[in-house]
Amino acid sequence: MSCTPCRPQKRLTRPRSQVPRVQTLATEVKKGGVEVLAAVPLSEETEFKVELFVKPVIGNTTAAQDGREPTPHYWSISSAIHDKESGSSIKVEETPDADTTVCYSLAEIAPPDIPNQVSECDMKVWELYRMETELLVVPLVNALGNTNGVVHGLAGTQLYFWAVGGQPLDVVGVTPTDKYKGPTTYTINPPGDPRTLHVYNSNTPKAKVTSERYSVESWAPDPSRNDNCRYFGRVVGGAATPPVVSYGNNSTIPLLDENGIGILCLQGRLYITCADMLGTANSRIHTPMARFFRLHFRQRRVKNPFTMNVLYKQVFNRPTETVDAQVGVTEVTMVEEIGPLPPSIQTTLPTSVNLTQLPRTVTLQSQTPLLNTQQNSK
């Protein structure tokens, strides 16, 4: 009996698993209400640096005269905090004097104009991408004096705050306690009942720091806004906490977000807001002499939010002169079609010329008002 040879079995091969292709979607990054594009390469023409000192601001108790608001006090030491009735420096006031209140300092920078800034598709704007800031301070020893052989020093509540943005800083109006109302002169106090403003709610007022009249005890930065802004603040409490201030010119603060985009100067302006308190001594608030800023700008391309039609209407199609003209004018519609003319204007045209040889636009003069021939020519 012969054996049939076994057929070789085919080796089963599993199909190779194909790596799924990841579909890349177009990323659209918006900031400040515009679509942000690539940055312009750095060069001498596309980079800009500015340095400035911002002075501290203390309120002014002078009332408004002739409709003019009082100017702020650029002091580093406030007036003495005391009670108006007893003169004691212990009782806390519900309406303190304005010259004992620290307000936000405000500065505005206008970068230079960019040549060939706008094209049909995009436009170039200045972008703040890094900065350096520090306080101008000195130790206070002999300047504070001594009592009973003990040298005084600064202590108490401290505040360190700065903000840079393409628009003024957005703030919310709050009160430290349910009885605090703020100064009666100079400062802009949050409208509303202090009993409801000492805790955030849906009726909390909002504003923008457009002047140096906003107190640091009544207005706080709004974390739900300030999209095109970067701010930093630190509050140190305690009745006897001494200030610890570090300063130097070897630290750089990057201002780029998670998409690598800095502060866009879409309106051609950069707004700087700051407020600092070192503590109190002899019932007076002490602040630094100034805060120093060194700002570095570069150019960034953004998508042009204006179409040519909008630019034409806003720039070219705007009357240069304002006139007081008649409003009851009768409008007459003329059509450029060959047809019989009304009898009232037949005598004004030459009879020896063919109507087809006339120009497309003809000025007709008549002793009587012209009639609308649009419906008759159809």
Curated annotation (Swiss-Prot):
Q: Which GO cellular component terms, listed alphabetically, does the Swiss-Prot or TrEMBL entry include? A: host cell nucleus; T=7 icosahedral viral capsid
Localization, per the record, is: Virion; Host nucleus
Among SUPFAM superfamilies, the record links this protein to: Group I dsDNA viruses
Gene3D superfamilies per record: Capsid protein VP1,Polyomavirus
On assembly, the entry states: Homomultimer. The virus capsid is composed of 72 icosahedral units, each one composed of five disulfide-linked copies of VP1. Interacts with minor capsid proteins VP2 and VP3.
- Region of interest (Disordered), ranges: 1-21
Q: What is this protein called?
A: Major capsid protein VP1
Q: Which domain of life is it from?
A: Viruses
> What Pfam families would the database entry show?
Polyoma_coat
Q: Which InterPro entries does this chain map to?
A: Capsid_VP1_Polyomavir, dsDNA_vir_gr_I_capsid, Polyomavir_VP1_sf
Organism of origin is KI polyomavirus (isolate Stockholm 350) (KIPyV)
Q: Which UniProt keywords apply?
A: Capsid protein, Disulfide bond, Host nucleus, Host-virus interaction, Late protein, T=7 icosahedral capsid protein, Viral attachment to host cell, Viral penetration into host cytoplasm, Virion, Virus endocytosis by host, Virus entry into host cell
| Function description | Forms an icosahedral capsid with a T=7 symmetry and a 40 nm diameter. The capsid is composed of 72 pentamers linked to each other by disulfide bonds and associated with VP2 or VP3 proteins. Interacts with sialic acids on the cell surface to provide virion attachment to target cell. Once attached, the virion is internalized by endocytosis and traffics to the endoplasmic reticulum. Inside the endoplasmic reticulum, the protein folding machinery isomerizes VP1 interpentamer disulfide bonds, thereby triggering initial uncoating.
Q: Name one GO molecular function term.
A: structural molecule activity
* Family classification: Belongs to the polyomaviruses coat protein VP1 family.
Set out the biological process GO terms recorded for this chain's protein. Answer: endocytosis involved in viral entry into host cell; virion attachment to host cell
